[in-house]
């Protein structure tokens, strides 16, 4: 049975003060505090801006090697793809996150494509080039477009030893259903919430404004155990970060798995 690690998508939210972090805790100490409770964290700041070596070194040091890191790929590799994405941006991104791999704390790079990334010949070629370019770093791929749910895609990911990211998100046209698929030795699940009304209409905070019930999380347990039987490690991350709901649900899932 694989090791199951639970955490949140991002940790540096000021609105979590007095909900998770002590009210007077400086933001520079958030990661150290987070690591006292959780054993994995998904870093998402790297999507919005290219990480720096010093940032990554500081995070490794502040973690005290108590958590396993997943770092989200920079948007220039997934959402704002150009002719320079592979030859220029990719090497820069790989170099910037070397402190994690040097300290053996980097478990995967999360490559999350937008809904506009369609299942086309050019997209398939790009996907393979990106995964190969990130090697030897482990890669896990999240699609937001249902077109990619194909056995041929799973086979390609297996061939490239890249993980498939399972998701829980609103039941809307073109989004992915809650399937449990393993294509590498890493199982991966992201809980985005089920806020149908705000998924397209709201901003990023409103989109992920959702608190899972215990019954909704319990329904995932068989899928988590299935992934654990097929992999060496399973990550479960909560992205419903508004008002620290991700913390509430991460704790809830931890308790359910420990029963």
Regions found by a protein language model. Give the residues of each.
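Residues lining hydrophobic/aromatic ligand-binding pockets adjacent to catalytic sites
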Residues: 1-259
